[in-house]
Amino acid sequence: MTRVTVQTAGVHYKWQMPDQLTQQLRLAHDLREDLVTLEYEYEDAVKAVWSSYPAVAALEAQVAELDERASELASTVKEEKSRQRTKRPSHPAVAQLAETRAQLKAAKASRREAIASVRDEATERLRTISDERYAAQKQLYRDYCTDGLLYWATFNAVLDHHKTAVKRIAAHRKQGRAAQLRHHRWDGTGTISVQLQRQATDPARTPAIIADADTGKWRSSLIVPWVNPDVWDTMDRASRRKAGRVVIRMRCGSSRNPDGTKTSEWIDVPVQQHRMLPADADITAAQLTVRREGADLRATIGITAKIPDQGEVDEGPTIAVHLGWRSSDHGTVVATWRSTEPLDIPETLRGVITTQSAERTVGSIVVPHRIEQRVHHHATVASHRDLAVDSIRDTLVAWLTEHGPQPHPYDGDPITAASVQRWKAPRRFAWLALQWRDTPPPEGADIAETLEAWRRADKKLWLESEHGRGRALRHRTDLHRQVAAYFAGVAGRIVVDDSDIAQIAGTAKHSELLTDVDRQIARRRAIAAPGMLRAAIVAAATRDEVPTTTVSHTGLSRVHAACGHENPADDRYLMQPVLCDGCGRTYDTDLSATILMLQRASAATSN
């Protein structure tokens, strides 16, 4: 048995992306846009099939009418909320909206039933539409890879990602949630891929062979320098950093020769490695991902490999981790943990993993206040930037009002005061500043200088806020991963619950708290990211082959573990502690939940 791991390395921030990489990223972006267009056409064709049946068409007309009515009522309710300054306004439209939405839900259910009744009859037509979509996707391969310059592995990766997105959207729609593929503008970001194909007679794709630039089987696709882990583990930190500064060479599509033929292209990527794959790892692929951070582009490389299983861990305590977010003196509590044995928390993590008992068997996981403070500071910088945008907009509108419309640099529509008044994004003003910097409009040297001065100041604020916020959030993510690595290193089993953080957060929107308070709570929850903590813990446990048990979240807060009484579902759980109706004692819902999680996990593993 094997398990799949992805080892990520950061690309040097001063690396200048070659034009060949930009070309491949743009082709991958265009491919995704074409796939989205094909999916739109496929959905329209399927809808046309269902609409061809009179019973379904009649229900679709009813759904459209009710949907329009619900939108009108929702707008009225929104206006009343603003006018009455409450989340629950007193107005007839509120009841009408609830009734209309109920009718809309029933009409959609009736439409699904009508579709189900004619599905067998429409099977052949649907199969034809599906075959046409598959043929169109194959034609895209010929256009982009056979006749074009896109690398085939990147095509496969984009197509796989697209199919995954389509499945996710179908699952959301099945649950009654709105979901739709969308087109995206090109912003210089994306991912290219390399796949290492292996025949049965080929040698194993070990790190040593992939690192061999002279005789390696796959040297024409990927070269990743490698140090044996036995040697790596003996190095000190400085030696590891020096040995980890390497250049990865990977295939990056093709270029077109003057005679029309194609030539394979490679790129050299400087990275910083922090760990090495085992000697018996089987490397299958590599991905170079470019993301935007402010005005800059940052890149990372991920190496995908299969690693032989070493067998599940069967020693160590069982640790239950219950998610939740509450404010504390030291930060935001994102989870409560309980262990069946005492834990010796490392000194470096004692500010994040706290203990609440002398036995060191229960405690909390805290995101320190300093992370939230850093994010808040950079949000303040971003707000100053927004105010500066308002000022430059007013200045430009006043100038255009006085001097009249100006010709667009390459579009037929002129730049008018009315159109600029609608501009919201800073990038539009920055674009105009760059256009007028070298060729200002007639009598517009002053406004061109004003725009350029604003652009320079805005770029500085943009970089400061985006890079600062990114560093703060990466600090939080690193703390989550350190906590996850520690728990996976000491636990014999990890227990988590299946709480839906998004659903809980959505429910919180309907609270009676003031809107500003709700926003502050939501902002702190997003910064603390309890869902990311759970994902990190599960990923670390999977990596280290620690058994993981997921228990139901139902009743974890309502049931008092000490007496077993299940309290009613009301608003008492928003505050700590909670009064139990069964025994009359108060209890901490989070601590009680961890006891219940251990009990449920024990029952599940014993069956």
Curated annotation (Swiss-Prot):
Additional notes on this entry = Part of a type V-M CRISPR-Cas system.
Per UniProt, Mg(2+) binds at: 590
Residue span of region RuvC-II: 589-607
Q: Which cofactors are required for activity?
A: Mg(2+); Zn(2+)
Known partners and oligomeric status: Binds crRNA and target dsDNA as a monomer.
Q: Which residues bind Zn(2+)?
A: 560, 563, 580, 583
Q: What keywords appear on the UniProt entry?
A: Antiviral defense, DNA-binding, Magnesium, Metal-binding, RNA-binding, Transcription, Transcription regulation, Zinc
Q: Where is this region: Disordered?
A: 74-94
* Homology family: Belongs to the CRISPR-associated DNA-binding protein Cas12m family.
Could you tell me where the Basic and acidic residues compositional bias lies?
Answer: 74-83
Task: Note down the stretches annotated as region RuvC insertion.
Answer: 391-452
Q: What are the start and end residues of every segment in region (Recognition domain (REC))?
A: 17-189
Renumbered residue ranges of the record's region Target nucleic-acid binding (TNB): 552-588
Q: What is the lineage of its organism?
A: Bacteria, Bacillati, Actinomycetota, Actinomycetes, Mycobacteriales
General function of this protein: CRISPR (clustered regularly interspaced short palindromic repeat), is an adaptive immune system that provides protection against mobile genetic elements (viruses, transposable elements and conjugative plasmids). CRISPR clusters contain sequences complementary to antecedent mobile elements and target invading nucleic acids. CRISPR clusters are transcribed and processed into CRISPR RNA (crRNA).
Outline the segment boundaries, as ranges, of region: Wedge domain (WED-N).
1-16
Source organism of this protein record? Gordonia otitidis (strain DSM 44809 / CCUG 52243 / JCM 12355 / NBRC 100426 / IFM 10032)
> Which residue stretches belong to region RuvC-I?
316-559
The protein's name in its UniProt record = CRISPR-associated DNA-binding protein Cas12m
Q: Does the keyword Membrane apply?
A: no
Which portions of the sequence form the region Wedge domain (WED-C)? 190-315
Comment block on domains: Has a bilobed structure, with a recognition (REC) lobe and nuclease (NUC) lobe. The REC lobe (residues 1-315) is formed by the discontinuous wedge (WED) and recognition (REC) domains, while the NUC lobe (residues 316-607) is formed by the discontinuous RuvC and target nucleic-acid binding (TNB) domains with a zinc finger domain. The crRNA-single-strand target DNA duplex is bound in the central channel between the 2 lobes.
Q: Could you tell me which residues belong to the region Roof in REC?
A: 50-124
GO molecular function terms noted in the UniProt entry: DNA binding; metal ion binding; RNA binding
Q: How is the cofactor bound?
A: Binds only 1 Mg(2+) as opposed to 2 usually seen in other Cas12 enzymes; lack of the second Mg(2+) results in loss of target DNA cleavage activity. Binds 1 Zn(2+) within the target nucleic-acid binding (TNB) domain.
Per the record, the GO terms for biological process are: defense response to virus
Practical application: Has been repurposed to perform A-to-G base editing by fusion with the TadA-8e adenine deaminase and tested in E.coli and in human cells. The small size of this protein may facilitate its delivery by adeno-associated viruses.
